[in-house]
């Protein structure tokens, strides 16, 4: 163990691999949160995502014609910074034109976190709903950002 004031560095050996663990602050000075999510659902509708994954009513969303570059979506359901892009064009690979693209920016993640938390749910519960409803082969994450905010007087 190396101790330099309040910063302590521990050296551990585990299964022959040397790992360094550096403790530079305490948990009370850090906050960690999900800051951006994007998920593609291969066989879903906007209504299904909104009602069964986000657990929100569809009538609070505004619907706009919108396109995403390099995607076949033609409409976007939106409330605040939560977006569900839908209405994929029918193609040979997708004859029913199904599929959605769920995006939550930082504020959208904060909003859905508050909603989940008020119902005693977590993001993990929401992700498990995705798995239960669509199976592992019918949805995938395209982006999942984590933000770590350091609230120390002196940042590390």
Residues covered by each model-derived region:
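Structured, helix-rich domain cores that form ligand/interaction pockets
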Residues: 1-156
């Amino acid at each position: 163990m190396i101790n330099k004031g309040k910063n302590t560095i521990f050296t551990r050996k585990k299964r022959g691999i040397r790992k360094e663990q550096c403790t530079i602050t305490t948990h009370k000075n850090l906050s960690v949160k999900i800051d951006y999510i994007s998920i593609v659902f291969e066989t879903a509708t906007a209504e299904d995502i909104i009602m069964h994954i986000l657990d929100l009513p569809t009538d609070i969303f505004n619907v706009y014609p919108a396109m995403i570059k390099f995607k076949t979506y033609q409409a976007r359901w939106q409330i605040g910074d939560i977006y569900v892009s839908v209405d994929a064009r029918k193609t040979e690979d997708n004859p029913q034109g199904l599929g959605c693209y769920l995006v939550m920016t930082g504020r959208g993640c904060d909003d859905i976190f508050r909603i989940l938390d008020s119902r005693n749910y977590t993001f993990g519960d929401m992700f498990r709903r995705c798995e239960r409803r669509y199976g592992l082969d019918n949805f995938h994450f395209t982006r999942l950002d984590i933000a770590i905010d350091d609230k120390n007087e002196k940042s590390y």
